[in-house]
Amino acid sequence: MSISQAGLGLAGVVSRVLALALEAAGPVAGEDLREGPTLVVIGATGIVGLGGDLGSVAERVRADLPRSEVLIVSDAVTAAVGALDGHPGAMVAAGTGSVGLGTDMATSWRVVDGWGHLLGDLGGGAWIGRQAMRAVVEAVDGRRMDPVRLREALTAELGEVDSWAAQLYTSDERAGILARAARPVAQLALEGDDLSAAICREAGRELARTLCAAAFPGASRRVTWTGGVVSEGGVTAQALRAEVLRRLPGAEVTRAVGDPLDGAFCLAERIGPRALQSLQERRLGAWFPMPTAAPEPRGLDSVSL
């Protein structure tokens, strides 16, 4: 569920998801979580760059879990920790948007891109969709040859070309609309469509630039990627791998081990005080310890959202 779709704000979305999680846990486990010390880890899109009152999010959590400690981090952090299984290295995540993160999992966290579809997110789904849609409208204007297969695929997905501007400029979900166009582009690229393949290869190169910029000496040569845009065997992933190995000849390219949910669990289990401090200093997260009036915890259960 996206925050804008829910119309609730981050605190409202967290409250709803937490209620569903407690319901799924069942009455016994849910009561244990309410009564016992609990660490809640929340990974959310855009919380750092877009600001917002994260304290109100922690308050919402404590309305249901009064003896909880709350860690709110960028989803780039949970994605990287999950993909790298808690080990040092660098990752690029490419879904609707794109972001790279390199870390030693202690005091250093380097974020690259993640600027959103208007300023960045190069190589992500919205970027791919925009390149494809732009090629089609240029053909409509007579500025290039008509990419027949691409135009047919995009109109099947999004409707007639003359409706695209209204769809995009009247919606709060522009990035999602653009990213919908990326799906047929990826399929056509696999089928040998020249323009679609060229767009996907350029996306892979852009993602490689992001990943290599996120990697830094002293962390690890381990690199990986995650997200639907870079699914294994696709043209984008192939171009990404080739460009990474060209730019970082000694890189240790590995498959992503886990997803952002795995990253949240890993943070709940392993994160230490130095990492907490560095995340806050880099404005990648916010830590809300247990209220001082609460008894000292003897152990922590974890709930990851």
Set out the residue ranges of the language-model regions.
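ATP-binding/phosphotransfer module of carbohydrate and carboxylate kinases, centering on a glycine-rich
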Residues: M1-T38, R62, G82-A90, M133-L305
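Phosphate-binding/catalytic loop of phosphoryl-transfer enzymes
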Residues: A44-P147, P291-S304
